[in-house]
From Swiss-Prot:
This is ER membrane protein complex subunit 4. Pfam families: EMC4. GO terms for biological process: protein insertion into ER membrane by stop-transfer membrane-anchor sequence; tail-anchored membrane protein insertion into ER membrane. It is a multi-pass membrane protein.
Amino acid sequence: MATPSNLVANRGRRFKWAIEFGSGGSRGRGERGGLQDSMYPVGYSDKQVPDTSVQESDHILVEKRCWDIALGPLKQIPMNLFIMYMAGNTISIFPIMMVCMMAWRPIQALLATPATFKLLESSGQRFLQGLVYLIGNLLGLALAVYKCQSMGLLPTHASDWLAFIEPPERMEYTGGGLLL
C-alpha cells in the first residue's frame, strides 16, 4: 500500500495508460506484488512518462506558419479586387466604406509590423518573409489609392485646387454712361 507522502510526491508526475499485450499479464504482475497490483486498474502504468506536450516545435511547421503570416496580405488582394469591382465607381456610402476599409487594413497591419516580426523571429528566412509581408501590405494600400483615384476622390485635376488659387487682379474698371 502506498503511503500518503508517496501519493503527494507522485501527484505532479505524468503517468501513461497502456496495455501491453505481449507480456504475460496486462497489469505487469512481475513488477508489482499481488496486494499492490489491485490498486491499479487494467492498463495503468505507474512509471513516469516524459511529458510530450511541451516538446520543441517541428521546424517545418514553424516555417510554414511564418510563411502563412507573411503571405496573408497577398492572399487578401484577390478579395480586394473583387470588392473593388462590386463596389463600382459611384460615390455613395457603400463604395466609400469599402475603400476606407481597404485602406485601413493595410495601414493597421503596417503599424503592427514590429509585433508581426516578433512572430517571425523563430524563422530562418525572416528577412524574406518580412519583405513579402511589407510588399503585400503596400500592394493592398496601392489598390485602395487606385480605387480612390478611379472614384474621383483624389485631387488630380487643376479644377480640384480652385479654392487655393488667387483670383486674378482686375487690370481696368469700366462702367456705363451714367455719372453719379
